[in-house]
Amino acid sequence: MRILLTNDDGVHAPGLAALRQQLRHLGEVITVAPATEQSGVGHSITYLTPLVPKSIHRDGVHWAWAVEGSPADCVKLSLAELFVDEPIDLVVSGINNGLNAGINVLYSGTVAAAIEGAFFGVTSVAVSLENSDDNDFDAAAVIARNVIGEIVRHEESRGGLFNLNVPTAATESASEVKVVPMGLAQYGRRYEKRQDPGGRDYYWALWTQPDKPPAEMTDVTQLREGCVTLTPLHFNLTRDDLLSEMKDWNLRP
């Protein structure tokens, strides 16, 4: 199995290295990641500047390709051009430093890279670890390898898109894996107002928990319980339930 690995924290991020090491147990790992930090860029794509893959070496051998672009750029360039003659079987994005759950999935460069893989019909998994003072990426990578290994074992997963989140508690002791829907709660809805030396106001985004997590079981609620969460996603944003009704609306140009 040929695995394309990327992330949004950059090619030198510890989460990428930890996941790369574990994914080697599942197959050949090709790493193509952003040259710099790309957190929160969502599904942005580079059109107006060239994408230049730069070989990164460790211990004298090629380790990864670094691209001055977004996570989605890395996957799109890889699948459409770099490895078009050597098909990729699995795209994995992570390990992100911080959870990607609830509505924040839509902001995530980590998840966007996996979505891009799914655009190409390749099974794709985004992996994120709860941010803490002492992130154990190695433990999270083992969890990710085990879950991903089970995902690809099932024919139904082929071409699918999956979002895996690992809470800190799960890296410290045994935890369950909960298959749950994406919640609608929003992390980080607050800003801190400050002033620069010139007296001008500016605002700093704060990473805060959702005010009122939903009562139903979602990724947000189960992460709070210390469970690993796995959510199957899709990128079709159509409101199918409204299509038929809207055809009867008196819509005119």
Swiss-Prot record:
Q: Which UniProt keywords apply?
A: Cytoplasm, Hydrolase, Metal-binding, Nucleotide-binding
The UniProt entry, under InterPro entries, shows:
SurE (IPR030048), SurE-like_Pase/nucleotidase (IPR002828), SurE-like_sf (IPR036523)
Q: Which reaction does it catalyse?
A: a ribonucleoside 5'-phosphate + H2O = a ribonucleoside + phosphate
**Enzyme class at the top of the EC tree:** hydrolase
Q: Does the keyword S-adenosyl-L-methionine apply?
A: no
The record's cofactor note says: Binds 1 divalent metal cation per subunit.
Molecular function as annotated in GO: 3'-nucleotidase activity; 5'-nucleotidase activity; exopolyphosphatase activity; metal ion binding; nucleotide binding
Q: Which HAMAP family match?
A: SurE
> Which NCBIfam families does the entry link to?
PRK00346.1-4, surE
**Any idea what job this protein has?**
Nucleotidase that shows phosphatase activity on nucleoside 5'-monophosphates.
Query: Per its UniProt record, what PANTHER family does this chain match?
Result: 5'-NUCLEOTIDASE SURE, 5'_3'-NUCLEOTIDASE SURE
The protein's name in its UniProt record: 5'-nucleotidase SurE
Q: Which gene encodes it?
A: surE
